[in-house]
A protein has these predicted regions:
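Adenosine-phosphate binding glycine-rich loop
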Residues: 2-27, 223, 334-449
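Flexible, glycine/charged-enriched surface loops at secondary-structure junctions
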Residues: 22-25, 41-48, 121, 158-167, ...
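Glycine/serine-rich phosphate-binding loop and adjoining beta1-alpha1 elements at the start
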Residues: 117-232
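Structured beta-strand/loop patches that form or line metal/cofactor-binding pockets in enzymes
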Residues: 44-75
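ATP-dependent carboxylate/acyl-activation modules
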Residues: 84-94, 100-127, 186-193
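Glycine-rich phosphate/diphosphate-binding loop of Rossmann-like nucleotide-binding domains
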Residues: 203-312
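Rossmann-like adenosine-cofactor binding region
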Residues: 267-366, 371
Length: 449
């Protein structure tokens, strides 16, 4: 599979310990494939077993979450927290609440988080958590009881200087609030143990917008430096209609682009006149409705069942912001055929390895998730800083810091790729830049894990 015998041994070890965990194995394979030149140039990595250690979580916590529904019936879900790597700082990563959550998904997300967090330049390690609980269709009371039960166990394993979870799919401001309240109740301390908190109890301005805004700052810098171009006058397709998609749409529009499509798990809407974001926010953030309602309210907009069709829409820039592996090889080929010039990932691993190969072999600019969507965790780390100082920055201050971080992530990835004769391969560059910092810290600390 790899040219390096060492990398093949490492991957075979992962396969033996994690059989059938396809998402995790895919993530490991993608990262290891980028590290061939780094391993060849640095024999200390093999001598000190750095790769064997970095692909194995420092700690995996699986637990039962029992809660009572509105009918008085006891329900049981499984909770997860994978503390993957703390070489450069406390574990940091979101909590995903979705029926698709399993050990493989959480491990893949935690593994990716190591490199994403490293790329921000901030002192945060990699971790991830979640549960197969589905908040959709649940009452506020049911969600509160689930979150309290979940945090009762999770609280034993986290802390402001140990592990700082955040939101993710299914975990928004409401869920973070319920979890924070339960942690405070159990520990009798007010501390920055979670990020994504409300502004009245330690949250940060611009956190809600951060992942979507950061995605566009990264993409704008990529277009500027590699194509001498920008969002201005470009047609943009954004998948998803959650937090990341909404604020990517907002920032892309502010930068001069025209977003013509959004989606959810049922289908997608196409508006050739440009998505009207106020309507989307009303449907998704206020009413918690489905994206098909957009077509019912806006003249000229069309709704189509199924999510995959969104990638058949002609566009200059594609921003997948929905979920993992949403762009497969077939969809990638259609995007290329229709003239896409840049793809940047707002979701975690939304493109399959085959799709990425199509983009790269076709000369399409490709911004990988671990770099392009790092704005959320970067601003979470800025929230941690504000909590430590007992101080709050203004929206513009946080936004300016976010933009600087995203611009630096692009350049660090670009330069790392160039260093190993992989110029233009931002995926390899992001993996290398993120890995080198973590590996150096691991070597300096000895065999601590």
């Amino acid at each position: 599979m790899f040219k390096s015998e060492y990398l093949n041994r490492v991957y075979e070890g992962v396969e033996k310990r994690s059989p059938g965990e396809k998402e995790f194995l895919q993530a490991v394979r993608e990262v290891l494939g980028s590290l061939e030149p780094v391993v060849a140039a640095n024999p200390k990595l093999e001598e000190n077993g750095v790769l064997e250690r970095i692909v194995e979580p420092e700690r995996q916590i699986f637990f039962r979450v029992s809660w009572v529904d509105d009918n008085g019936k006891v329900q049981v879900n499984r909770g997860y927290r994978v503390q993957f790597n703390s070489a450069i700082g406390p574990y940091k990563g979101g909590i995903r609440l979705h029926p698709s959550v399993n050990a493989s998904v959480i491990k893949f997300l935690g593994f990716e988080q190591i490199f994403k967090n490293s790329l921000t330049g901030l002192p945060i390690g990699g971790g991830k958590g979640g549960s197969d609980f589905d908040p959709k269709g649940k009452s506020d009371g049911e969600i509160m009881r689930f979150c309290q039960s979940f945090m009762t166990e999770l609280s034993k394993h986290i802390g402001a200087d140990t592990d700082v979870p955040a939101g993710d799919i299914g975990t928004g401001a409401r869920e973070i609030g319920y979890m924070f309240g339960q942690y405070k109740r159990l520990r009798n301390e007010f501390t920055g143990v979670l990020t994504g908190k409300g502004l009245t109890y330690g949250g940060s301005l611009a956190r809600t917008e951060a992942t979507g805004y950061g995605l566009c700052y990264y993409t704008e810098e990529m277009l500027k430096c590699m194509k001498n171009d920008s969002f201005k006058g470009k047609t943009v397709v954004v998948s998803g209609s959650g937090n990341v998609a909404i604020y990517a749409t907002e920032k892309a529009t502010q930068l001069g682009g025209k977003v013509v499509a959004l989606s959810d798990s049922n289908g997608y809407v196409y508006d050739p006149n440009g998505i009207k974001l106020d309507v989307v926010k009303q449907i998704k953030e206020v009413e918690r409705g489905r994206i098909k309602e957009y077509a019912e309210r806006v003249d000229g907009a069309e709704y189509h069942e199924g999510c995959k069709g969104i990638w058949t829409i002609k566009c200059d820039i594609a921003l997948p912001c929905a979920t993992q592996n949403e762009i497969d090889e077939e969809s990638a080929k259609i995007l290329v055929k229709n003239g896409v010039m840049a793809v940047a990932e707002g979701a975690n691993m939304p493109s399959t390895l085959e799709a990425i190969e199509v983009f790269q072999s076709s000369g399409i600019l490709f911004g990988p998730a671990k770099a392009a969507n790092a704005g959320g965790v970067a601003t979470s780390a800025l929230e941690m800083s504000q909590n430590s100082m007992r101080y709050s920055w203004t929206f513009d201050e946080v936004d300016a810091k976010l933009k600087d971080i995203m611009v630096n992530i692009f350049h660090n990835s670009y330069n790392a790729a160039k260093k190993y004769n992989l110029e233009g391969n931002l995926l390899a560059g992001a993996n290398v830049a993120g890995f080198e910092k973590v590996a150096e810290a691991m070597l300096a600390q000895g065999v601590a894990y």
